[in-house]
Regions:
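Thiamine diphosphate
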Residues: 1-169, 173, 178, 305-306, ...
Length: 323
């Protein structure tokens, strides 16, 4: 057990799996799979496994995804890291091929591939084209593809192991704003389920649900509300599909109030699906959601921060909802 960054925890998981499986490959562009951590050896996948297994491609995200998918169909586990500039480029391939081929083969063709999609978290100053967070909903809508979004280094490692070992294609959403987040992470290899939400704080007054880069804001708000006497149950989705409906319903049956918080756009955000599932199963509950406005993120940091949902918005709406 040691304090590790998100990046180090993920590459530690990949390194172990590549050592166990000599056919497993990693495909990337621009960003080399290298990570350092205080008191730990540097991880450099390309140096350890060579360029035949750790492939630095040209800048073509569609091609990267196609090679990853082809490797999986041929029997090799494969992971590709697609940076934020191209996170939407492989959509057609994942939607039309990765999400369907296993079903079209009657389950005979396994697809042990992981598509890591970097999300900028709508970083101030990146402007509209490279600042979007809405790919969470895009990929979660694809049948046959699991879509996960960890919010902590410990979950990031365990969910990466589970994703690599899963026979189905997994879109692994990577909130870039959490890259340098540090926490205690076990040294040994372990798994975190790809279909279970995590209850981060327990309470009876209000359920707040979020995922990925939204969770730090939710936990900050929950702390403020706790000091004001409100007992909040904060739930980290971790997996957008399959979504852990059971945990959501159980919580709202207790609190009777649900607030969802998303960094992605308001229309059809993950919170909308959360509310729909709870509404189908819990009578008499009250609902509210917070999300980014349906508008491209501006380049101006000041304008962007004015639009971005934050802990203050959660606190204000939570008090009105519980009121």
């Amino acid at each position: 057990m040691a304090r590790k960054t998100w990046m180090y925890a993920v590459l530690e998981a990949v390194q172990y799996e590549m050592r166990q499986d000599k056919d497993m490959i990693w495909i990337f562009e621009l960003t080399p799979p290298v990570a350092s951590n205080p008191g730990k050896p540097v991880i450099n996948l390309e140096k350890e496994f060579g360029r035949k297994r750790v492939v630095n491609t040209g800048i073509d995200e569609y091609w990267m995804a196609a090679c990853t998918l082809g490797a999986g169909l041929a029997g090799s586990k494969a992971v590709t890291y697609i940076p934020y500039q191209g996170a939407c480029m492989p959509f057609e391939l994942i939607q039309n091929e990765a999400g369907k081929l296993r079903h079209m083969s009657g389950g005979q063709a396994e697809m042990p591939v992981v598509f890591i999609m970097e999300m900028t978290g709508q970083t101030p100053g990146f402007a509209g084209q490279h600042s979007d967070y809405e790919i969470d909903t895009y990929y979660a809508h694809i049948p046959g593809v699991k879509t996960v979004i960890p919010s902590t280094p410990a979950d990031a490692k365990g969910m990466m192991v589970s994703a690599i070992r899963d026979p189905n294609p997994v879109v692994y959403l990577w909130p870039d704003g959490l890259r340098e987040l540090v926490e205690e992470v076990p040294d040994e290899q372990y798994t975190v389920p790809l279909d279970k939400a995590a209850v981060r704080t327990s309470g009876n007054d209000l359920t707040i649900v979020s995922s990925g880069a939204g969770m730090p804001e939710v936990l900050a708000a929950a702390d403020q509300l706790q000091k004001a006497g409100m007992k909040v149950e904060a739930i980290d989705l971790r997996s957008l599909k399959p979504m852990d409906t059971e945990t959501l319903v159980k919580s709202v049956q207790k609190t009777k109030r649900l607030l969802t918080f998303d960094q992605s756009y308001y229309t059809l955000c993950p919170g909308a699906e959360v509310i729909a599932r709870v509404a189908e199963n819990v009578d008499g509950a009250r609902f509210k959601r917070i999300a980014f406005p349906d508008a491209p993120p501006p380049a101006s940091p000041e304008m962007f921060l004015w639009m971005k949902p934050n802990a203050g918005h959660i606190v204000n709406l939570a008090k009105k909802l519980v009121g």
